[in-house]
A protein has these predicted regions:
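N-terminal propeptides
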Residues: 2-9, 16-186
C-alpha cells in the first residue's frame, strides 16, 4: 500500500504543474481504481476521455469498468477486490456468494427448523466438504457454499477452486441460490 502514497505524491505534483496533464490524470484514475475508490477513478477517466487525447481510448475502457463497478455497488472489501478481475475462479465466486449475498443467512431464513424429511444422501451432501478445499485461502467460503450445494462438487470430490468459472457454472450457482431462497424449484 506504500506505492499508493508514493504514486499519489508524484501524480499530485505533476497535476500541480499542469492541471490537465493527460497521463497524470489517467494514472491518478488507475491509482484510485486499485485503491477501490471507484467514483474518484470514474471522474478521472471521464476527464481524460473528454480531453480526446492520446490516452482517451484507454481511459474510456477503464471508465466503463469503473462505471460497472459503481453500479454493482460491491459492499465488502472482497467484492471490491474481485470486481477488478477480468475472470474469476470458483473460489472467488464462493467468496462473493458467501460475503456479498450472505448466503448462509439467506439459507437459514429460507429453511425452517422442521423443513421436512431428508434422505441420508441429502444429509451427507449438507455436511460434505470438497477434498481439495483444505488449506486453500478460500477454504471457509468454499465449504460454506458446498454445504448448501450451490457450486457443484460431489461429496468428497474435488471442487477445483482455482479453475476459472464459466458462464454455465455461474448461471447454475445463481439459479440454485434463487431457487433455494425463493422456494421455487423450477
Amino acid at each position: 500500500k506504500k506505492w499508493y502514497r508514493d504514486a499519489e505524491k508524484v501524480l499530485k505534483r505533476a497535476l500541480k504543474r499542469e492541471k490537465k496533464h493527460e497521463q497524470a490524470t489517467y494514472y491518478t484514475g488507475e491509482m484510485y481504481l486499485y485503491k477501490h475508490q471507484f467514483s474518484e477513478a470514474e471522474s478521472r477517466f471521464r476527464s481524460v476521455v473528454e480531453g480526446k487525447g492520446e490516452y482517451s481510448g484507454r481511459a474510456d475502457r477503464m471508465w466503463q469498468l469503473s462505471q460497472k463497478i459503481v453500479r454493482a455497488m460491491p459492499g465488502t472489501d472482497i467484492g471490491k477486490k474481485v470486481a477488478l478481475y477480468e475472470e474469476i475462479t470458483r473460489a472467488d465466486l464462493a467468496v462473493l456468494l458467501a460475503e456479498e449475498l450472505r448466503v448462509s443467512v439467506l439459507m437459514e431464513k429460507s429453511q425452517s427448523p422442521g423443513s421436512g424429511f431428508q434422505t441420508p444422501s441429502q444429509v451427507n451432501n449438507n455436511s460434505a466438504v470438497p477434498s481439495d478445499s483444505e488449506g486453500h485461502w478460500a477454504e471457509v467460503w468454499i465449504n460454506e457454499i458446498s454445504r448448501y450445494g450451490i457450486l457443484e462438487a460431489a461429496p468428497g470430490q474435488p471442487f477445483y477452486p482455482d479453475e476459472t468459472i464459466n458462464r454455465a457454472e455461474y448461471a447454475m450457482a445463481i439459479q440454485r441460490v434463487l431457487s433455494i431462497t425463493t422456494g421455487d424449484a423450477g
